[in-house]
């Protein structure tokens, strides 16, 4: 009997990527092979995104391609919450499940492609760290599912439910397994990382025989003992985040915070129903930088939210200039089906949204470029992601750069035979542009 093969298409954010990794790991554990193309697959699983309209369309297109090329398709992920929409366009998909519905996906696979008999996972070994879709030297670590907030532009709680935190012992054991597998950088992700453990009332758990609370600070402190890069994403600026800045100042975890501020106008933040909107974020940023001068802050913002006036937008620009954030992403407001913000009055015309986006990016590009210019002459440690095919250049990142969303450090004039992805290098920064740094190699620190 031939080994059954399952194709897999993964769309969406890093949290969805982790869901895909978990399903793929279970498939491999049960003896399925993962097909490299549509033709060789007995069926195809498409893990979708449903957050904004462009992502919905991309997901529907991916389902259509899988149906056209293979014809036997199971749909999962955030868009799976809207089965009617999927079946209107693709009525013949085999099954539709929601986000993080691992067991439902596996049951659907079993129904249409039974698992191979006599499979022994202890002989057909799956790596301890599971199947990963990222390069070997970094990995995403998802610590919770869902969110307790009800931001008016977001439908994540309706797709993924309220906050459910993983036991801290499970989180730390996965992190340790990743380190043993050679991972040099862990990126901590969730919908609301700094709320970790709230739902469990910070329940006590155990790791390596030691008691650890299921709590944001305690988890970060334990991760900091692993001796690898630990990067925090999706952190809301709650008061208890201040203590984690101390860990950064001590070199326990990377001095990098990804905080989705989204706006600065109190009126717009209230319309958005953002948590911590009443916090004086500028004072908080100043305090953090006093504690940890190397701190890098990345954030995302929405311009053109319903009801945003020119005065609101100017408040945002003024805040941006004063905050001097290192890395920033910006989006024009896009209606999301099911979001309560759709019902707000005074929607902003598209041409004004675009004009505000361009003004916003112009201000931030000047800030980012000036900050990168100050790096010239500094010595930094970087992690190599890849090597250029045609040039003697390593594409790397410093502590200030998360993969895919931030900039790179291009290490020039190297001997490519001595360097590979996953190596840590010590470099001197020689030049900069608006987003990236350029450097020369001082020495290879670790391989």
UniProtKB/Swiss-Prot annotation:
Gene3D superfamilies: Methylthiotransferase, N-terminal domain, Nucleic acid-binding proteins, tm_1862 like domain. Residues 133-370 form the Radical SAM core domain. Residues 4-114 form the MTTase N-terminal domain. Residues 373-443 form the TRAM domain. Binds 2 [4Fe-4S] clusters. One cluster is coordinated with 3 cysteines and an exchangeable S-adenosyl-L-methionine. [4Fe-4S] cluster 1 binds at residues 13, 49, 78. Its main location: cytoplasm. Keywords: 4Fe-4S, Cytoplasm, Iron, Iron-sulfur, Metal-binding, S-adenosyl-L-methionine, Transferase. Pfam families: Radical_SAM (PF04055), TRAM_2 (PF18693), UPF0004 (PF00919). One of its GO terms (biological process) is tRNA modification. It catalyses: L-aspartate(89)-[ribosomal protein uS12]-hydrogen + (sulfur carrier)-SH + AH2 + 2 S-adenosyl-L-methionine = 3-methylsulfanyl-L-aspartate(89)-[ribosomal protein uS12]-hydrogen + (sulfur carrier)-H + 5'-deoxyadenosine + L-methionine + A + S-adenosyl-L-homocysteine + 2 H(+). It is an enzyme of class 2 (transferase). [4Fe-4S] cluster 2 binds at residues 147, 151, 154. GO terms for molecular function: 4 iron, 4 sulfur cluster binding; aspartic acid methylthiotransferase activity; metal ion binding; protein methylthiotransferase activity. Catalyzes the methylthiolation of an aspartic acid residue of ribosomal protein uS12. Belongs to the methylthiotransferase family. RimO subfamily. This is Ribosomal protein uS12 methylthiotransferase RimO. It comes from Acinetobacter baumannii (strain ATCC 17978 / DSM 105126 / CIP 53.77 / LMG 1025 / NCDC KC755 / 5377).
């Amino acid at each position: 009997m031939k080994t059954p093969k399952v194709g897999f298409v993964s769309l969406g954010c890093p949290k969805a990527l982790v869901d895909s990794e978990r399903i793929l790991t279970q498939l491999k554990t049960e003896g399925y092979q993962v097909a490299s193309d549509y033709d060789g697959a007995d069926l195809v699983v498409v893990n979708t995104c449903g957050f904004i309209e462009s992502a919905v369309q991309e997901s529907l297109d991916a389902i259509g391609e899988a149906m056209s090329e293979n014809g036997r398709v199971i749909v999962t992920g955030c868009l799976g919450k809207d089965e009617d929409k999927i079946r209107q366009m693709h009525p013949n998909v085999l099954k539709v499940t929601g986000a993080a519905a691992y067991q439902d996906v596996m049951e659907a696979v079993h129904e249409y492609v039974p698992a191979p008999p006599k499979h022994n996972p202890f002989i057909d070994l799956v790596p301890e760290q599971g199947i990963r879709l990222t390069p070997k030297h970094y990995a995403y670590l998802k610590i919770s599912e869902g969110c307790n907030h009800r931001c008016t532009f977001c439908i994540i709680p309706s797709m993924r439910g309220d906050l459910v935190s993983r036991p801290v012992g499970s989180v730390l054991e996965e992190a340790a397994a990743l380190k043993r597998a050679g991972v040099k950088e862990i990126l901590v992700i969730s919908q609301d990382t700094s709320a970790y453990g709230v739902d469990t009332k910070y329940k006590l758990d155990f790791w390596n025989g030691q008691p650890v609370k299921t709590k944001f600070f305690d988890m970060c402190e334990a991760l900091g003992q692993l001796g690898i890069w630990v990067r925090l994403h999706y952190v809301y600026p709650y008061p208890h985040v201040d203590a984690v800045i101390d860990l950064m100042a001590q070199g326990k975890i990377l001095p990098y915070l990804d905080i989705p501020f989204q706006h600065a106008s109190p009126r717009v933040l209230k319309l958005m129903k953002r948590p911590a909107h009443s916090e004086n974020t500028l004072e908080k940023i100043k305090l953090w930088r006093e504690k940890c001068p190397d701190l890098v802050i990345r954030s995302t913002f929405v311009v053109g939210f319903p009801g945003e006036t020119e005065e609101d937008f100017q408040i945002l620009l003024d805040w941006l200039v004063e905050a001097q954030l290192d890395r920033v992403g910006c989006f024009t407001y896009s209606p999301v089906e099911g979001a309560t913000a759709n019902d707000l009055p005074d929607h902003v015309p598209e041409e004004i949204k675009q004009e505000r986006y361009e003004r916003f990016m112009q201000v931030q590009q000047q800030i980012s470029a000036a900050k990168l210019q100050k790096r010239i002459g500094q010595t930094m440690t970087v992690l190599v992601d890849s090597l250029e095919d045609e040039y003697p250049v390593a594409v790397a990142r410093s502590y200030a750069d998360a993969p895919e969303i931030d900039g790179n450090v291009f290490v020039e004039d190297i001997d490519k035979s001595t360097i590979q992805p996953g190596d840590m290098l010590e470099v001197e920064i020689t030049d900069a542009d608006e987003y990236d740094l350029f450097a020369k190699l001082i020495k290879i620190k670790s391989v």
